[in-house]
Amino acid sequence: MSDIIDEVISSFKTSSIFINREYLLPDYIPDELPHREDQIRKIASILAPLYREEKPNNIFIYGLTGTGKTAVVKFVLSKLHKKFLGKFKHVYINTRQIDTPYRVLADLLESLDVKVPFTGLSIAELYRRLVKAVRDYGSQVVIVLDEIDAFVKKYNDDILYKLSRINSEVNKSKISFIGITNDVKFVDLLDPRVKSSLSEEEIIFPPYNAEELEDILTKRAQMAFKPGVLPDNVIKLCAALAAREHGDARRALDLLRVSGEIAERMKDTKVKEEYVYMAKEEIERDRVRDIILTLPFHSKLVLMAVVSISSEENVVSTTGAVYETYLNICKKLGVEAVTQRRVSDIINELDMVGILTAKVVNRGRYGKTKEIGLAVDKNIIVRSLIESDSRFADLWS
């Protein structure tokens, strides 16, 4: 058995494909970010007052997944921090991962060298300590809140309001914010007081086109792959497939990396187009699984309801039909159902993450209705649901 492990490790160490695959990972930030020069210039100009130890304007950054928002913000802050040594501190928090008000405040405190218990303090006490920490720090602090839309939808904007009030309670030291979101309409959800305070500057990141993605992939490929293993047509195909899906650079890099890994597993010396299509299928399967495993329980029940209806002939999945099926599932499991309005919201959320499709259609004299369908393979959904909770196996059988 250990021979198998040794064989795998040996083939990994002596890869015929990669020099260093880390250059293809989404959290790698290169020395240059092509096709984002305008955004880099604008963010840097907004943050330039940090050089004089003055508070810059707050920024909201919008753009679809994989358009370079997080990479550009980290890139600019890193460069400015080196040039403005000691004049400011920057803190990055992904609020989808650090996903409670307690942990957000605790992380901010720890970034200012204030230790707090993992739990046990009130939000009011954490806030009081944060105000004191900012006052004691004595320099500017830039707080980056990534994926902030998911956090606000879950907990409302109370924490943002609290954070926006800190500057009124301190003197020299000030906090400024950079909010990053995939949702262009997110700012409309905010309390007007929070909106006026935090969205002083707004920057939109457009999707990359196929040519830009090809350029990005070519630069990364030169660092990641061994010479001669990656034909130009493979890079073009990865760029074209990612451009078709709203110009997602992260998707393009994943396609290229996984294509190389498949070539490696096949013990091939070149990456082929067929491996790109295999990579596309593998990535989609993993993406759907990861989303479903982290869904709230009632979102999984709604998804199961849509799957059940899609298996029936001549039945259209409307919101009403989905809700009726959802109620039956809740009854079978002995759980209390949520309202039809909440189920409608869940359907929209599953549409946004690409698991369902929900489109409004005009049915003549019957008026408009929303038709709901599956955006991904049904079998992948069912397997993922069963993996997340064994009770779904009984519902499907």
Curated annotation (Swiss-Prot):
Keywords: ATP-binding, DNA replication, DNA-binding, Nucleotide-binding. One of its GO terms (molecular function) is ATP hydrolysis activity. Autophosphorylated in vitro. GO terms for biological process: DNA replication. InterPro entries: AAA+_ATPase, AAA_22, Cdc6_C, Cdc6_lid, ORC1/CDC6, Orc1/Cdc6_arc, P-loop_NTPase, WH-like_DNA-bd_sf. SUPFAM superfamilies: P-loop containing nucleoside triphosphate hydrolases, Winged helix' DNA-binding domain. It comes from the Archaea. ATP binds at residues 67-71, 208, 220. Induction: (Microbial infection) At least 4-fold induced following infection by Sulfolobus turreted icosahedral virus 1 (STIV-1) in strain 2-2-12. Belongs to the CDC6/cdc18 family. Strain 2-2-12 is a substrain of P2 that is highly susceptible to infection by Sulfolobus turreted icosahedral virus 1 (STIV-1). Monomer. Interacts with Cdc6-3, MCM and PolB1. Involved in regulation of DNA replication. May play essential roles in origin recognition and cell cycle control of replication. Binds to DNA, with a preference for molecules that contain a bubble, a fork, or a tail. Inhibits the binding of the MCM helicase to the origin DNA and strongly inhibits its DNA helicase activity. Also regulates the DNA polymerase and the nuclease activities of PolB1. Stimulates the DNA-binding activity of Cdc6-3. This is ORC1-type DNA replication protein 1. The lineage of its organism: Archaea, Thermoproteota, Thermoprotei, Sulfolobales, Sulfolobaceae. The gene is cdc6-1.
